[in-house]
């Protein structure tokens, strides 16, 4: 926990940007009957009966200090999709950075081995050399600032039923462009001293052990 909090407390470094990564499964629903458009004297009528038409996965990448985020929509959530997100970070999002510090949870696919399971060894090694991984504690996903952005993503893209993967991708692209144009940053205020005071129960009682 303190490793992540100390990282958040550091001043921004353009050569070593901090990026928080998380993902969310998405259920795709389509209306069972088409909506009726409005007509003179009558409002549009929307049928609220929907059927499930599939699932997708949304990767959220957030650089909290610079107001940048990227949402990658995939049909599956395997090590392959995760590895491609890492390559996007290195080659597209921050090509000039010497090292990208990635905060993420302990999901089984969130591991450098996913790179080697996806790309040739030389390519996997190239990407891995540019990344530095930091993990939130088990049951401590609230420490990942990407979760804040996921909540905003849900309200912006998932509050209405989705008719399919294309609909989700279109909504996501519009949401991402709008959010990045706003350049909204995240100011994390919970610090290591706060954790030692407010979450003291999570620390071992060293004094008692020495008595």
List PLM regions with ranges:
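Extended, low-complexity cationic-aromatic segments
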Residues: 1-87, 199
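Short beta-strand segments
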Residues: 19-21, 101-104, 134-136, 189
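C-terminal domain-tail junction helix/linker
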Residues: 32, 167-177, 181-211
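RNase H-like polynucleotidyl transferase catalytic core
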Residues: 45-51, 123-145, 160-163
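Short, basic/hydrophobic alpha-helical segments
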Residues: 80-101
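Acidic/histidine-rich, metal-coordinating catalytic segments
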Residues: 97-111
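Active-site proximal helix-loop segment of RNase H-like, two-metal nucleases, encompassing DDE(D)
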Residues: 138, 146-164, 178-182
């Amino acid at each position: 926990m303190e490793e992540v909090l100390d990282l958040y407390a550091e001043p921004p470094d353009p050569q070593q940007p901090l990026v928080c990564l998380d993902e969310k499964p998405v259920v795709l629903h389509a209306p069972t009957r088409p909506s009726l458009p409005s007509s003179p004297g009558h409002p549009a009528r929307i049928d609220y009966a929907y059927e499930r038409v599939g699932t997708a996965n949304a990767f959220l990448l957030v650089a909290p200090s610079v107001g940048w985020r990227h949402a990658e929509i995939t049909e599956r959530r395997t090590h392959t999709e995760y590895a491609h997100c890492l390559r996007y970070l290195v080659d597209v999002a921050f090509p000039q950075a010497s090292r990208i510090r990635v905060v993420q949870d302990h999901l089984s696919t969130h591991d450098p081995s996913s790179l080697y399971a996806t790309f040739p060894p030389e390519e996997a090694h190239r990407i891995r050399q540019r990344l530095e991984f930091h993990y939130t504690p088990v049951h401590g996903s609230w420490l990942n600032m990407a979760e804040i952005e996921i909540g905003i993503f849900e309200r912006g893209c998932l509050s209405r039923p989705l008719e399919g993967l294309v609909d989700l991708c279109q909504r996501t692209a519009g949401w991402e462009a709008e959010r990045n144009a706003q350049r909204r940053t995240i100011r994390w205020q919970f610090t290591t001293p706060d954790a030692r005071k407010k979450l003291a129960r999570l620390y071992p009682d060293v004094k008692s052990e020495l008595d």
